[in-house]
Amino acid sequence: MIYIADSYAWIEYFIGSKKGEILKKLFLDEKNKFLTVECCLAEIKGWCLRENQDFEKLIKIIKSNSNILSIIEYDWIDAAKEKFEQRKLQKTFGLIDAMILTKQKELNCKIISCDKHFKNLSSVIFMD
């Protein structure tokens, strides 16, 4: 199975929380492949700055466990449409979440997250 791990999932994994155990267990199955959308790296860097964490160490962990998905112009355009549609249902649905959802639909994979915006969406493993 292919999974997109979002920023929230990575952070829970890094702090070793109970929620993060879900991602850790998925890493153990060699059949699973993991992706990280590059815009999530900016969110993780922001978290590192706020929490005084070593981003260089964490990005090495991310890169050793997942492939980084580059974003191109048309991805942003598609994400803007996805954000518009999601905002009809969730008023605070953001552009980064829309980008992750856009890539999930494009690649027909699953998202791993504990972000409330993904809770009731299909193809999401929600980390409770």
What is each stretch, according to the model?
Residues 69-112:
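Active-site neighborhoods of divalent-metal-dependent phosphate/nucleic-acid chemistry enzymes
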Residues 51-55, 86-88, 127-128:
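Short, hinge-like loop/turn segments at secondary-structure boundaries
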Residues 5-6, 36-37, 93-94, 115-116:
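Histidine- and aromatic-rich ligand-binding microenvironments
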Residues 1-36, 47-60:
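Short, well-structured N-terminal submotif of metal-dependent ribonuclease cores
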Residues 10-11, 41, 118-119:
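A generic structural signal for short hydrophobic patches within well-formed alpha-helices
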Residues 33-35, 64-70, 110:
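Short loop->beta-strand "edge-of-pocket" segments that line small-molecule binding or catalytic clefts
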Residues 26, 101-128:
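Acidic, PIN/NYN-like endoribonuclease modules and their adjacent C-terminal/linker elements
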